[in-house]
Amino acid sequence: MSSHADSNPWTVPALAQAKRAGRKLVMLTAYDASFARTFDANGVDLILVGDSLGMVMQGHDSTLAVTTADMVYHTAAVARALDRALLVADLSFQADATPERALDAATQLLQAGAEMVKIEGAGHKLEVIRYLVEREIPVCSHLGLTPQSVLRFGGYKVQGRGEAGEQLRRDAQAVVDAGASLVVLECVPTPIATQISAELSVPTIGIGAGPGCDGQVLVMHDMLGLDSGHRRPKFVKDFLAEGGSVAGAVRAYAQAVRDGSFPDAEHAYAA
């Protein structure tokens, strides 16, 4: 049972209320008004304008080429279509290198219609998170596999196994202590993601992090089974195949997240 009336717009405080009520959060990426409107009307709680647009919209091999101007353009397009879902937008590569740069980029994104900005990593990013939150800008943290760090990681690999899992737990608590209102966990083994989700006071959103998170997110192209030109990750499921239409696929995805049937073991990583 939902603790949030379907007709009510989502707010940042409502996310924490959903966690306390045990209500799973449904998130998808979107990059234009048409898809965003469809997602908003069919049960999606949060829309992410991700820098993944560099790969699925622009054809790059990574997210590194995406600029703040790109993010502002797509954020504004999506924002015009939303009535209910809460809009989150990524800070692009190195836009959060310093607190001042992050404030400039985040201000542009909020002026374009975003209600929260997403920042990858912990470490020196903790200062950035605190700086933004102190200036009334809601922040979503992104931990685990952080795509902007692909060169350092040597590819898109599972993060948080073994001793790295303990560091991930510490990082997750640190970003919340710095003021993050939401934490995305990407490509993290199910046991550690479940443990982190239980420990944090704010919701976690998983992508390849198992069913123990407080919600799930997928890139829309992956959820619809579209060929992005890249190898399909283990955690991806084609909901268009069973939904029969884009709207049907979104409803099937939302229902599967809420009833806990997605992700299952086939779409998650073991310890």
From Swiss-Prot:
Gene Ontology CC annotation, any one: cytoplasm
Record keywords: Cytoplasm, Magnesium, Metal-binding, Pantothenate biosynthesis, Transferase
Enzyme class: transferase
Highest taxon above the source species: Bacteria
Residues reported to bind 3-methyl-2-oxobutanoate: 51-52, 90, 118
Catalytic activity: 3-methyl-2-oxobutanoate + (6R)-5,10-methylene-5,6,7,8-tetrahydrofolate + H2O = 2-dehydropantoate + (6S)-5,6,7,8-tetrahydrofolate
Pathway: Cofactor biosynthesis; (R)-pantothenate biosynthesis; (R)-pantoate from 3-methyl-2-oxobutanoate: step 1/2
Biological process terms in GO annotation: pantothenate biosynthetic process
Residues reported in the UniProt entry to bind Mg(2+): 51, 90, 120
Xref: InterPro entries: Pantoate_hydroxy_MeTrfase (IPR003700), Pyrv/PenolPyrv_kinase-like_dom (IPR015813), Pyrv_kinase-like_dom_sf (IPR040442)
Recorded GO MF terms: 3-methyl-2-oxobutanoate hydroxymethyltransferase activity; magnesium ion binding
Cofactor(s) the protein needs: Mg(2+)
Pfam family, one: Pantoate_transf
Family as reported in the entry's similarity comment: Belongs to the PanB family.
Protein name: 3-methyl-2-oxobutanoate hydroxymethyltransferase
